[in-house]
Amino acid sequence: MLSNSELPDRLRAALQAVDHRWRDVPLEPLRDKGLAHHHVRLVGAGALARVPKQSQLGLSAAANLAYQRACFECASVSGCTPQYLGFLPVSVDLPRGALLVQEVVGRSALLPADLPGIAGSLAALHTLTLPLASARAPLLNAVDPLAALADEIGEQAAHVPAVSLDRSVALTLDRELGRLRRLCSATARPERRFIAFDAHPGNFIVDAQDRAVLVDLEKCRYSYPGLDLAHATLYTSTTWDVDTSASLTVRELLDFYAAWSAATGPLGTGAQAWHVPLRRAMWLWSISWCVKWRALSGLPAMANADGEDWAAERSDTALIAHVRDRVDHYLSPGIVGQLLDEFDALERAFCA
């Protein structure tokens, strides 16, 4: 298991083993902010090394690198994501390998001021030309993305009996999952597009040109843009990262959706009826993930380098304390009720 203190020496050895052109550049570990990766700056190279702690999709170490490479390469055409620069293979020094990507220099997103920029960047992703189905691998491309999402939420919610959870919250989770499954039983679906599926504001850096750059691209897939729009603006997303924390009003949410719709033309017009249903689904995914993390984070780290691993010991203690605080907050009855009220308010506004 890699720690931040070990990273420079391990990364240096991996660079030297392949005689990489950046083998001798200074290496600077960044603050531990995420549960899936360490990040190391290759000083002077304009590059970052993304060193996986785990695969959130449950992939082998090599498959995880290939998946992330595809994410960056597909998204880069949009002009609002970092460029893919290469990879370091799975090795003794880096058991999960590393991806090398362009370093984006800038600041954290400020909400609500940067919401129009985030909407524009997501619109650029969502309006990319959809490749033929045969050319979409290795990215997820479920036969029915809505049903696949409901199944994933169900798998996460299966951890409810193993955790301490307020009964009203458990009942709400079960009721909302039932609502989603009923939606799946109908035939109507929104338009499928390339999406990030991890578009919370903490994953954006605003550069010197005021461009909102989406820098974390490990879970991209072909699914529904409304999931990204929700993940960018849900309370469980906007208050996740301390550097971007904000609570948005219904008016600010409506303005965000309007900005995205204006930038996407017919796609935006057809998507409006799905904004609230997909927002509820993305929130349900988020809080069921919180349940899963609460259940699994106390387990010891896995000995091998493949698959999913939420062990708290893989991350800095300050980061884990922050995540635990957020998980407890989002699973509290008051916050669950607050989100349900927001969904109702948005539904009324969209129908007005």
Q: Which sequence ranges carry the predicted segments?
A:
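An alpha-helical support segment within catalytic cores of ATP-dependent transferases
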Residues: 7-23, 130-197, 208-209, 265-271, ...
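A cross-family kinase active-site recognition segment
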Residues: 87-91, 107-172, 182-193, 219-223, ...
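ATP-binding pocket architecture of kinase catalytic cores
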Residues: 30-152, 189
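Conserved protein kinase catalytic core
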Residues: 56, 108, 204, 222-224, ...
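Active-site acidic catalytic loop and adjacent metal/ATP-binding pocket
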Residues: 30-43, 48-49, 180-227
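ATP/Mg2+ or Mg2+-diphosphate-binding catalytic cores
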Residues: 288-352
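A general structural signal marking secondary-structure boundaries and capping sites
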Residues: 19, 76-79, 88, 126-136, ...
